[in-house]
Design a protein with these regions (language model features):
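Conserved binding/catalytic microenvironments
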Residues: 162
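Solenoidal tandem-repeat scaffolds enriched in leucines and small polar residues
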Residues: 166-170
Length: 170
């Protein structure tokens, strides 16, 4: 397994109160595989208000009940959009959305990677070559919400119990 180390620059300009990263302002050190989450509204896993809890609610068929349904959603601050997830692997990556925590990510555009979110707030990705990536243990948070999962290990496609690469963070 080869882990490329690259540096990328984002010329979005300086923003007030934006902190400089380890590589400097506007620069990103691309080192380890990771999964990032862009929270749309409320975090998907936020109890009773997040996408996982409200996505299956049925919209009433009567027009007056529909207005009441949507007004309740807006006024109570319940989530109307799923969070976007972006993952980075040594030989690629992708993005997508989870319909529920129980089903694999729907990648957009579609690819052959299998991305799963586990009950213990860890994630697993199996790439199209069968390599397995485990994320969790070390995470970045905004408030109480995880916004980035860092890779803990990469395992062989033929021998999943054999760890090829382990990542340790301070």
């Amino acid at each position: 397994v080869t882990i490329p180390v690259t540096l990328s620059y984002h010329s979005s300009g300086l923003k007030p109160k934006e902190r400089s990263g380890v590589a400097g302002t506007g620069w990103t050190l691309n080192l380890e595989p990771s999964v990032s989450r862009h929270i749309n509204g409320v975090a998907d896993d936020e109890y009773r208000e997040g996408w996982f809890y409200v996505a299956d609610e049925q919209v009433p068929w009567q027009p007056d009940k529909q207005m009441e349904f949507y007004e309740k959603k807006v006024n109570n601050g319940t989530d109307m959009r799923p969070d976007k997830f972006i993952y980075k692997l040594p030989q690629g990556g992708g993005s997508g959305y989870f319909r529920t925590r129980h089903t694999p990510m729907w990648t957009v555009p579609r690819n052959n990677d299998l991305v799963k979110w586990n009950y213990d707030d860890t994630m697993n990705i199996t790439d199209e070559n069968g390599l397995q990536y485990y994320f969790g243990g070390t995470c970045e948070k905004t408030g109480d919400n995880i916004t980035r999962w860092l890779c803990s290990s990469i395992c062989s496609a033929r021998h999943p119990e054999q760890q090829l690469v382990n990542f340790y963070y301070d």
